Amino acid sequence: MWLRRRNIVKEDSVVRGMAESCPPKANMIKNKEHLQQIKDFSGLKFGSISPTDIDGFLDFGNRLFIFVETKFSKSELRGGQKLALERLCDACQTQSRTSILIVTNHESSGEIDIGETVVQQYRLRGVWYESTDITLREAIEMFYSNFAIIKKEDK
């Protein structure tokens, strides 16, 4: 399964509804000063185990979980961070919920528009897939339209 750029069908009420309720350029950073604080996890090292972070997480009605990790300039997800995020993503996958881990790249030295970062690879149902030429925003819209159909009785 290759994730590739495609035209998002504007008539698709699910995608249209998502786009209307979540404009692409909505600034969600509430306190930039706190964002720039360095978090020191050195006091939480247990042998070779240390904490990792997640750059983004979206929960679409408990039907679709999307984890996002963003890397600079084609850096790869590796080692303990890769293993931890794989395990988290796979553990959240259930019969009624799809869980996806998306790794993106950026070349920015300043502020990063995460939605415009390019998808490098993604993990779905325990398998890694390579991707090219699609932004994170486009990928999320595609996954949403395929996996997060919320039934009326679930509302």
Map each language-model feature to its residues.
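Acidic-basic catalytic patches of nuclease active cores, encompassing PD-(D/E)XK
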Residues: 2-50, 142-155
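Short, positively charged
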Residues: 47-55, 59-60
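Active-site-adjacent loop/helix micro-motif of nuclease/hydrolase catalytic cores
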Residues: 49, 74-84
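Conserved catalytic cores of phosphodiester-cleaving nucleases, focusing on short active-site segments
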Residues: 56-58, 65-72
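Short, charged/polar surface micro-motifs in flexible loops or helix N-caps
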Residues: 65, 73-76, 106-109
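A conserved alpha-helical element in kinase catalytic cores
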Residues: 80, 84-94
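Nucleic-acid nuclease catalytic cores
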Residues: 92-119
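Helix-rich interaction surfaces within compact, conserved domain-sized segments
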Residues: 112-155
